[in-house]
């Protein structure tokens, strides 16, 4: 665990924005060609359903996901999935703060950034107009198509949440449905509050779907229990389109397990740690820190 000291910076506008793109950086040791148009279209259709390739060259390929229609005030159209051509990867923008929260790749993150000199960037477009659950499943399907299209990919970086994962972990997962988005599109972060015994755990990535991220400010509980609670609550919020109202309670934790006998109160607040966003702050009762 890192002993580096970071400062709160809620003026940081560089971070992910609510409803922003689900942008994936695929990292490679060697340059890679754009797969041919027919192959890309076939694999996209296999994972996503009815697909139309509306642009294709060495620099970019674009696909309309015909089963996923975004509706706007002045009309509607299928959402788009874009894949860029291979480019050099210089590791810019990955500061110590971001690196400190790459929990899935702690053993490999420095090696990945050292060895991977090339990247392919992929992103969704117009998807902010979709319902949260539909977008979550589409983005997860898109990721699985990319993993199949680029077998030499070493690692995936998910810009919306700051997660870095080895490609083999993406390819070998056994997760189904919307929990795939929770696994790859939501990061649970952990911070010690300097000069105190307090800890802070929050999520980044739920706001991509216009859903609340979570925040816990606490002491004297195993942080791994809280991390598990955060992933479980995030999954519940996504699956049920955020049914939790301000001031309501949810099941707390006892001995590492969700427990109905313990109720923790929820309230909507602004995040304590960047990026600026709305969060569902979970008051952990006897374990809670900070004034509310």
PLM features per residue range, with description:
Residues 1-44:
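N-terminal alpha-helical "arm" segments
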Residues 20-30, 116-127, 282:
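Short, hydrophobic/proline-enriched secondary-structure or compact coil segments at domain edges
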Residues 25-28, 32, 127-135, 218-225:
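Conserved aromatic-histidine-acidic binding/catalytic patches
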Residues 32-111:
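N-terminal low-complexity, intrinsically disordered segments
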Residues 36-40, 131-142, 222-229:
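Short amphipathic alpha-helical segments
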Residues 45-56, 141-156, 236-245:
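Structural alpha-beta junctions
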Residues 84-187:
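Internal, hydrophobic cores of structured domains that mediate oligomerization or house catalytic pockets
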Residues 159-292:
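Aromatic/basic-lined ligand-recognition segments
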């Amino acid at each position: 665990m890192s002993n580096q000291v970071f400062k709160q910076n809620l003026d940081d506008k560089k971070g992910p924005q609510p409803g922003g793109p689900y942008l994936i950086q695929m990292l490679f040791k060697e340059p890679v060609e754009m797969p041919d148009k027919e192959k890309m279209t076939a694999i996209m259709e296999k994972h996503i359903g009815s697909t139309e390739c509306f642009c294709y060259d060495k620099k970019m390929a674009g696909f309309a996901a015909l089963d996923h229609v975004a509706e706007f005030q002045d009309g509607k159209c299928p959402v788009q999935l874009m894949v860029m051509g291979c480019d050099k990867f210089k590791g810019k923008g990955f500061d110590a703060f971001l690196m400190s929260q790459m929990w899935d790749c702690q053993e490999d993150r420095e090696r990945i950034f050292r060895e991977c000199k090339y990247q392919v960037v992929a992103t969704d477009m117009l998807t902010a107009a979709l319902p949260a659950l539909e977008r979550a499943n589409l983005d997860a399907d898109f990721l699985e198509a990319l993993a199949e299209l680029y077998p030499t990919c070493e690692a995936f970086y998910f810009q919306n949440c700051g997660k870095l994962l080895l490609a083999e972990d993406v390819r070998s997962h056994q997760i189904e449905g919307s929990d795939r988005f929770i696994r790859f599109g939501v990061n649970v972060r952990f911070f010690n509050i300097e000069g105190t015994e307090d800890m802070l755990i929050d999520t980044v990535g739920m706001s991509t779907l216009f859903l609340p991220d979570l925040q816990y400010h606490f002491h004297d509980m195993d942080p791994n229990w809280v991390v598990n609670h955060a992933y479980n609550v995030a999954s519940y919020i996504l699956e049920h389109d955020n049914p939790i109202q301000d001031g309501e309670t949810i099941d707390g934790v006892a001995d590492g397990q969700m427990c109905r006998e313990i109720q923790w109160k929820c309230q909507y607040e602004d995040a304590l740690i960047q990026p600026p966003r709305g969060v569902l702050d979970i008051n952990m009762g006897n374990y809670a820190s900070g004034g509310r």
